[in-house]
């Protein structure tokens, strides 16, 4: 399985909180940091509430980065999520096998890694950030590793291709609907993120528009325009996140179009997925993993299975046919409801 993207403080694609390092003063500091791969220098602000507290990288406004034209992904050296993207997949697996052997080999034999048939475009949840350029152009993309500087992404080799197309359309609609993009430094603007969740087996797609305010002008017209361009979309939800946080999804949802959730099938079981619910981002490999775990558990339909931190209960429900009883333990009420 390919490495997931790390988005500089955003959960990964819940894929990974990078920070600007420890800070020792209560006041906010500004640091200059040089990146050899860019040939430029970026200003990164980090906030602190006390000693030895990890500061959250704030928005970096420099666009001085260099693409790598010799790479399959021209920004892989900057986003930090796909360090192995230019390796043949068999070599990727060999490198990961070597790493796992080094970690666990002293404790016993290590089985061979089970690879994917198609290790590309597997990710069923995609999160995009946006920025308005001085020219007025809206770019969408991911955060450069360790910063909140947005790197434009046209095609990501781990993300669902339909999700990528929807994100491109939404960036165009931001401009045509004259919506303001949220600025982390000033706390102004409306659009924080766009998150796409895809049911790989059902084909259902949920679009989550994360806003900094519940007031969202023309949201129904915007949703209609998005669905017209992409009729495969089954629901559009406004998620409201008014906090000064690096977390993408807030606590409040307002359904704009459709049911407000999607469904997918995993291990032969049907699951409901809401905006705040955790669901494995690589469902193909998840089925392989769960199948192995259930096989090794060797259940005889006499046991009680406790699915701790269960989310929407995928592991416990997948094992339910072989257990006498399944108990799921979860704090997230939305996940329990699903």
Predicted features and spans:
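Rossmann-like S-adenosyl-L-methionine
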Residues: 3-18, 22-28, 37-41, 48-49, ...
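Extended interfacial segments that mediate partner engagement and assembly in macromolecular machines
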Residues: 66-71, 78-181, 201, 216
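Residue-level signal for inorganic ion chemistry
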Residues: 82, 194, 236
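Nucleotide donor/acceptor-binding cores
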Residues: 124, 203-205, 302-303
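Accessory substrate-recognition/RNA-binding modules or partner subunits associated with SAM-dependent
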Residues: 152-154, 158, 163, 167, ...
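RNA-binding accessory domains that recognize and position tRNA/RNA substrates
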Residues: 156, 192, 197
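Short helix/loop segment immediately N-terminal to the Walker
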Residues: 181-188, 305
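Short, aliphatic-rich beta-strand segments
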Residues: 196, 202-212, 270-274
